[in-house]
Amino acid sequence: MSFKREGDDWSQLNVLKKRRVGDLLASYIPEDEALMLRDGRFACAICPHRPVLDTLAMLTAHRAGKKHLSSLKLFYGKKQTGKGTEQNPRQQNELKTESKTEAPLLTQTRIITQNALHRAPHYNSCCRRKHRPEAPAPSVSSPPLPTAEVQLQSAEISKEPEPRERSDAKESAALLASAPMSPTKRRVLNHYLTLRSSGWVPDGRGRWIKDENVEFDSDEEEPPDLPLD
């Protein structure tokens, strides 16, 4: 089937070209194997004499011929040889180095001499060294402090404030050991010491309250009264 153009309408020519390109692609013909001319005909780009064919069916029949197939083999053979010669310099250098490899006998001799010159065995990362138990380090004894520093430290320790309960007990003991007291005063003093030792604290208003830092066994809110004779 042929498509002949009538007139000089460029729009019709473009439509015709699109249709021919579509037909060419529909026939699975590579673009570099066929050329479409301006008059709508096809030229074979593989054959050396460039045959011009009117229709796509004629081009398909030409591509099935023996001459075209032989030309196709030559065409792709030249392409393959061209690709082989277009190697980069790095690949060429690698090929040269591979061609200049040493003889296996020389390589084996060099390896034997290197192994003979090695005195220490090769290190293997898989082997672990056995740790020997180290001797305990000698304990360094601190030098004795001078006598003056010892005296200063003992003086500072003696100056530390004593707990409140101990100071109160000492004061009460000093009061008891001092001048003789009447039985009433002694009973009041003993009651005071009993309350202080039980966790009661005077609030400064003549009352006794529980110390927050002391735990009581009972829930009494008032301290025990002064015992009678």
UniProtKB/Swiss-Prot annotation:
Transmembrane segments: none annotated. GO terms for cellular component: nuclear speck; nucleus; spliceosomal complex. It is linked to Allele R187X is a disease susceptibility variant, which modifies the severity of the disease jolting mutant (medjo) caused by defects in Scn8a. It reduces the abundance of correctly spliced Scn8a transcripts below the threshold for survival thereby converting a chronic movement disorder into a lethal neurological disease. The keyword Ubl conjugation applies. This is Sodium channel modifier 1. Its main location: nucleus. The modification Phosphoserine is found at S2, S182, S218. GO terms for molecular function: enzyme binding; zinc ion binding. Residues 157-171 have a biased composition (Basic and acidic residues). It is found in: Nucleus, Nucleoplasm; Nucleus speckle. The lineage of its organism: Eukaryota, Metazoa, Chordata, Craniata, Vertebrata. The keyword Nucleotide-binding does not apply. It comes from the Eukaryota. It holds the Pfam family SCNM1_acidic. Residues 80-105, 128-187 are annotated as: Disordered.
